[in-house]
Amino acid sequence: MSMNKGPTLLDGDLPEQENVLQRVLQLPVVSGTCECFQKTYNSTKEAHPLVASVCNAYEKGVQGASNLAAWSMEPVVRRLSTQFTAANELACRGLDHLEEKIPALQYPPEKIASELKGTISTRLRSARNSISVPIASTSDKVLGATLAGCELALGMAKETAEYAANTRVGRLASGGADLALGSIEKVVEFLLPPDKESAPSSGRQRTQKAPKAKPSLVRRVSTLANTLSRHTMQTTAWALKQGHSLAMWIPGVAPLSSLAQWGASAAMQVVSRRQSEVRVPWLHNLAASQDESHDDQTDTEGEETDDEEEEEESEAEENVLREVTALPNPRGLLGGVVHTVQNTLRNTISAVTWAPAAVLGTVGRILHLTPAQAVSSTKGRAMSLSDALKGVTDNVVDTVVHYVPLPRLSLMEPESEFRDIDNPSAEAERKGSGARPASPESTPRPGQPRGSLRSVRGLSAPSCPGLDDKTEASARPGFLAMPREKPARRVSDSFFRPSVMEPILGRAQYSQLRKKS
């Protein structure tokens, strides 16, 4: 009976006693943590049906294992019930002591987090204030001392300036400066015309407002400088505008300006194109030399192709330059000069852009870094450049000779041009003497010098009057009465013939004609 009553009493006493596990689970911190775990577990189960089935299987397994463990441990628990009761009481007392010492155990997690955040922020704020407040106070003191020193220095400077201005020398200097500035202002007002906008406005201000105090010297000087600069700019702009309008009335200036603009744009295009083409060939040439040492056969084939390409490029450039130099001369002296200047500018720009590549290629050839094709291409470009410059010089000379009349003696004409005068033809002699044949004495010898024209024309005195009376008496009247005829048309060997103004072909045109023939 005693054995049967024991468990009944034990079962009756358990609900009345406090359980440590229940109290721990009832704590807000523990309950909130359990709720978080439960929510996480439920969300994981709902993520996928397969996960939910696996979790349900594990739950059933754990539940069955716990039931089996409780059924197997029941006899042991009944025998050790007194010891478990004593341990439960001790645990409850310790839990009461912890709740008294740590009241945060009774708070929810949200309140604990907010209080923790507040305490951390207050600690950080206090630490920051402990560091920043001394620095701020020190900086304020330093700034205050600096400002006080600056104010003291400014005050001393003002007092010194006022004292110097109140002295006799200062008053004389200020009066002289005021007088000089006033005279300059009067001269400027007298010489410069008043502004259209400022004149009526100044009159209105005088009628409406009372006279103000006299401005300082610095303000007056700045106003005078602004007035002079503004008037200078206006005068310069007006002069430029008038000059432009007058220059446009001159015949030939408008096309010259358009040609200058076109030449500038063409020069910029040429410079940009040449800058894009010019490259620094050091690394490429070094790599090419290394490749040549490894593969000689492939290099020979590549050299042949490169030579052909370079020859084509050089021929194209020469054709372009020849076309530039072979352009027809425009009508008029101004057009010819402008055309020549444009051609010279183009060739100069091309020479300047080719010079770096030519110098680098020559240096690389000396240092055995560049192959022979680079030297040949550079040489070809140099030759084409020299030909272009020669063509330009020939064009300039032709233009000058064509439009500038030079004296006859300055042009070294050969003796062949005067042979027609020294040695007249038989038809001319027949016309001069009528139907009579010319006597052998009156015709000059083939080797006769230029001075023998006097004897032919009958201007020199006879050397032997006894012998020449018969011939002179018959020939002199008819020869003197004959008018001088113009010589036949001759082709001169010099640059131009003074009698007829005609353009002469340059070297580039002659070379093109030879090629075409």
Swiss-Prot record:
Its main location: endoplasmic reticulum. It holds the Pfam family Perilipin. The modification Phosphoserine is found at residues 81, 126, 130, 132, 137, 174, 314, 384, 386, 410, 433, 439, 460, 492, 494. Transmembrane segments: none annotated. It is found in: Endoplasmic reticulum; Lipid droplet. Interacts with ABHD5. Interacts with CIDEC. Interacts with AQP7. This is Perilipin-1.
